């Protein structure tokens, strides 16, 4: 499996956009809608996967680059007017093929929260805690259901729920439990000793 993990590590970097410090959804499509597509949630999810791989195959330069990808994805993908991470974006500001692009979905926020926790545990840089506060505040205000548990999945750009359902063909019980489990495990490993 080691060789497959190395291949996965190498396969991610052709998607890297150094100007924006993000991972593009598709590589090699030049100036097409598919080639300009950025999904903050996917970029952040792949970035934390890469940090896990880099724990197995250490490379300080790549690790720094992945931390830049997390920061770039958060900065580029964050809606400065209404908060939250966009679902999809065209990196040149053109319309996307995805009609739901301006929506805010639950799963990019779960990926972002775990990514910043992991980035902080690796770097110790407090900027990740500022991002954690911003992400946590947004996610728990807009997605978490304090009365019945679980998370709602879909908000419009302004942060208003568009659907009250908590499960469908796309929203299952995967992203929320995974980010909670990984976050708890990470925090327990880094808990100060008594």
Predicted stretch roles:
Residues 1-194:
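Glycan-recognition and catalytic cores of secretory/periplasmic carbohydrate-active enzymes
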């Amino acid at each position: 499996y080691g060789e497959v993990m190395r291949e996965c590590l190498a396969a991610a970097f052709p998607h890297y956009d150094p100007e924006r410090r993000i991972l593009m959804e598709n590589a090699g499509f030049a100036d097409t809608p598919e080639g300009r597509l950025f999904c903050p949630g996917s970029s952040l999810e792949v970035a934390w996967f890469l940090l896990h791989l880099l724990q197995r195959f250490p490379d300080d330069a790549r690790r720094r680059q992945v931390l830049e990808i997390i920061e770039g994805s958060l900065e580029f993908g964050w809606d400065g007017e209404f908060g939250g991470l966009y679902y999809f974006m065209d990196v040149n500001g053109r319309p996307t093929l995805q009609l739901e692009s301006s929506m805010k979905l639950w799963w990019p926020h779960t990926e972002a929260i775990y990514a910043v926790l992991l980035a902080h545990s690796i770097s110790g840089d407090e900027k990740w805690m500022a991002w954690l506060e911003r992400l946590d505040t947004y996610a728990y205000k807009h997605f978490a259901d304090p009365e019945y548990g679980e998370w709602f999945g879909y908000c419009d750009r302004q942060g208003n729920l568009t659907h009250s359902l908590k499960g469908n063909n796309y929203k299952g019980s995967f992203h929320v439990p995974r980010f909670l489990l990984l976050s708890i495990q990470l925090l327990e490993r880094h808990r100060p000793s008594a």
